[in-house]
Amino acid sequence: MSFRVKGWSDQFSESFYERATTLLTAALNKGTKHSMIADHITVKELDLGPQPPQLEILEVGDLAPDRFQGLFNLHYSGDASLVLQTKIRANPLSVQKSNVPSFSSRNTMLASRAPLTVPMFLRLSDLKLNGIVVLVFSKQKGITVVFRNDPLESVRVSSSFDSIPAIARFLQREIEVQLVSLFQEELPSIIYKMSRIWFAKSDSNLSFQKIPFTSPNQSHTSLANYNPDLLDGPPDYHESTKVDTHLPIKMGPLDVQTHPNIRSIASLALSRKALLPISSPSIPMSIYRSTPPDTIIQQLTTQSDDISAVSSPATQYSASDYLGSNDTTARPSIFGRSHGTSQFRRRERVKKRHVIKIHEASNKSASSSETFVGSKNVDLTESAFDSIPDTPTKIITNINKLKRNYTITNNWLENLQQKIPSEVDNGKVSGLQYSAFKLLMLQRLMAAKGSF
């Protein structure tokens, strides 16, 4: 969708051209200039012409009575013109003396042996633009125009040195580079400042609030210390009306010690010390954001040593005791929520595994100190059938062989013989597992003997 702008030439008054000329002059003299330019650049004439630009609406982001945000496609091929005046330094060439007699040549100055400052007029016309423009309008903040790409297609440059082709080509190239920088950097600032002036003049009831601040070292502000450059009014309004040829965008003085924003930032930086481990309670296995890296490594190493020292040698703990399926740590951490860990997660129950290791007796005569190695925390009242594996690795068929190789008293064998019939009568032991059952009962008795 596109629209036309009616009354383009009637919208700009003489005061507008004066203000635009002043701001454009300050923008052209900003920064470093070329070494050939010997004086300030002055805008002598500015004419936007009767032909308006063409705008095509691509997107409308926000629309309200006091604000607007949209994306436009800008096309302009009008008769706007700009005339500049400055002084340049000519590069004189030292021409060698010719052997031609003087009567055969004209008495004209061919070159200069010293630098010359020559005035120059520069005229820009036949401007053609085509680009994407982001327009943001706010009645309280002004108008912001930003070009997403390079809008310049072509421009005609005419100067006082058009008779010299080398200088004409050089000026054409340099002016195009400067116009690209003007459209992308300086023009948005000029439009913003002028929009603040328009809104301040059209509506004097705009509420621009200023935050009152009293210096801690000074209870009141005297007239002697009052800065006339900082007047009460809309933000940037009075600053925009003052023009500095060296610095067009002027900012007011900022007191680092007493400015409220600087003090707020300093207070926020000091409040970060509350997160240090020195002033906050220490949580095991937690990594603090303000903790140095060497402290983190030392803290984790100490805690891992404490955990390994507490575990019993007769009990093995699996990895699930410390790490869950979805958790990276088993204790509270500031990164717990990012991994799906709840703040009130219940601590998992420690799982114990009883490990029974049986060593086979050698062919030589075994010593009386050889016993079965197993866990000492074995309950004799537990059913022996529950501890028998489904597929035993080895079946002992001769109990007398165990009696020969190991020192077993008659009292131990009687307890074993009393335990076996009780299990058989209850129907818990099958015929295939009978020998393995006897071996396990003997191992339990030997383990109980070692625990006394």
Curated annotation (Swiss-Prot):
It is a multi-pass membrane protein. The keyword Oxidoreductase does not apply. It is found in: Mitochondrion outer membrane. This is Mitochondrial distribution and morphology protein 34. Its main location: mitochondrion. One of its GO terms (molecular function) is lipid binding. Lacks alpha-helical transmembrane segments, suggesting that it resides in the membrane via beta-sheet conformations similar to those predicted for other outer membrane proteins and porin. Keywords: Lipid transport, Lipid-binding, Membrane, Mitochondrion, Mitochondrion outer membrane, Transmembrane, Transmembrane beta strand, Transport. InterPro entries: Mdm34 (IPR027536), SMP_LBD (IPR031468). GO terms for cellular component: ERMES complex; mitochondrion. Residues 1-196 form the SMP-LTD domain.
